[in-house]
Swiss-Prot record:
Biological-process GO terms, alphabetical: translation
Function: Binds 16S rRNA, required for the assembly of 30S particles and may also be responsible for determining the conformation of the 16S rRNA at the A site.
Presence of keyword rRNA-binding: yes
Pfam families linked to this entry: Ribosomal_S14
Lineage, highest ranks first: Bacteria, Pseudomonadati, Pseudomonadota, Betaproteobacteria, Burkholderiales
GO molecular function annotations of the record: rRNA binding; structural constituent of ribosome
Full protein name: Small ribosomal subunit protein uS14
One GO CC term, this protein: small ribosomal subunit
Domain of life: Bacteria
Species, as recorded: Burkholderia vietnamiensis (strain G4 / LMG 22486)
Residue stretches in coiled coil: none
UniProt keywords, alphabetically: Ribonucleoprotein, Ribosomal protein, RNA-binding, rRNA-binding
Family statement: Belongs to the universal ribosomal protein uS14 family.
Length: 101
């Protein structure tokens, strides 16, 4: 199981991304808008750089909801592969069965 501090750090990043999402999108739109003056675009770029680093969605890491494992996490379930296997064998995920051919 991942350390609790790492899990909490990811939760904090998710909160920051949600908090600054609208502002970040507005600033990026200004930066990419060719009809704006160079000065306006430059100011928007500087303001974008002043936002917290962790408010950037690329810094987020998908983690297992149960264990906090950062790798092997399935987006559809939000769980790590080994937890999906355990839960699926118990029959707790509807429609998910072990493959046989």
């Amino acid at each position: 199981m991942a350390k609790l501090a790492l899990i909490e750090r990811e939760k904090k990043r998710a909160r920051l991304v949600a908090k600054f999402a609208a502002k970040r999108e507005a600033l990026k739109a200004i930066v990419e808008d060719q009809s704006k003056s160079e000065e306006e675009r430059y100011e928007a770029r500087l303001e974008l750089q002043q936002l917290p680093r962790n408010s950037n969605p690329t810094r987020q890491r998908n983690r297992c909801a149960i264990t906090g494992r950062p790798r092997g996490t399935f987006r559809k379930f939000g769980l790590a592969r080994n937890k999906i296997r355990e839960i699926a064998f118990r029959g707790e995920i509807p429609g998910l069965t072990k493959a046989s051919w």
